[in-house]
């Protein structure tokens, strides 16, 4: 349904700058709503994602979901990568974040599901050297464990190949 704010093309502020009260956290290995090791927090009006309290990353991918789904929207996001890779984190996950759009709800995800089925706008921070010297933003159709195929003979393991990751 269209809200009054949407009809007027007014911005709806999703984050209140104080807490995560309108958001649901989902961390792999935990039920929806459990913010394991305080992975997501608010400091100085900014949402922070930190794995500082983890001894080992162990594929504990974290996601945060807004309480209300939307179908028509524009997003304005500021992001910044700080610090080092989580201990035991995969190389491809270095400075890797993003926004999942048109995805499943956190409650519908299995406890050990890595990522929600969704469209992902991915933020990749640069390493300063190697394959991914600079930061970049990509978008992908992420439906796991299957790979979408659109009238193609391509045989690829994931939605993007290793070269495209960087």
What kind of feature is each model-predicted range?
Residues 1-166:
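Carbohydrate-interacting regions of secretory-pathway proteins
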